[in-house]
Design a protein with these regions (language model features):
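Residues in flexible loops and secondary-structure boundaries
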Residues: 20, 43-45, 107-109, 156-164
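A structural detector for beta-sheet-dominated domains
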Residues: 36-38, 102, 151
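Structured, beta-strand-rich domain cores
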Residues: 61-143
């Protein structure tokens, strides 16, 4: 049994896969992505449950049989429910399980044919792919929970961008000429 799994197809949201980002001021910047896993993907959910159970067992074994902390926070949430900090998840999360995964190290990024993915424009919030993630239990500084680290991302195909969208070179080809627009107000 392993704490590492490869997901089935998921939609990516909040992609920070080329440049690490700190979630709050003073925090360590991390590479991260939120995975939107369809509730219909029973196979991935079975793998997640088994990996979470294994992470709990490993925590107890590596801590001399220490009991599992009670009231563990989880990185896995129901997209049809409420966010952990209150309020509803966005429309894109409906019908999905939502899991945010991160890493201090840059994850392996590949195309469906396993060639390296090097263009940041190709991995955006809204595209689809698979992820290799590794579950672990944490109990530090009063925070207790089960989370998952991000090891790799495989982009499968494009999807409708979430949020601000994707800008391409052709978006600038609108015929605008600078020489006649020196004074736009006057």
């Amino acid at each position: 049994m392993s704490t590492q799994i490869t997901t089935g197809k998921a939609r990516f949201s909040y992609c920070n896969l080329f440049t690490p980002r700190a979630v709050q001021e003073g925090a360590t910047p991390k590479y991260s992505v939120t995975l939107l896993i369809p509730k219909s993907d029973k196979a991935t959910m079975q793998k997640i449950k088994a990996a979470m159970d294994e992470a709990k067992q490993k925590f107890m074994a590596s801590n001399s049989g220490k009991k599992l902390p009670t009231n563990l926070k989880s990185t896995l949430h129901d997209g049809d429910g409420e966010r952990p900090n209150g309020g509803e998840f966005g429309e894109e999360c409906k019908g999905c399980y939502v899991i945010t995964v991160s890493s201090n190290n840059k994850p392996v990024l590949v195309h469906a044919d396993k060639t390296p993915l090097t263009d940041p424009q190709e991995l955006y919030s809204g595209c689809y792919g698979r992820a290799i993630i590794n579950f672990y239990v944490y109990d530090t500084q009063g925070n207790k929970g089960i989370s998952a680290g991000l090891n790799g991302i495989m982009k499968l195909y494009d999807g409708e961008p979430l949020g601000g969208g994707v800008v391409t070179d052709s978006d600038w080809d609108d015929g605008w000429e600078d020489e006649d627009n020196d004074d736009l107000l006057g």
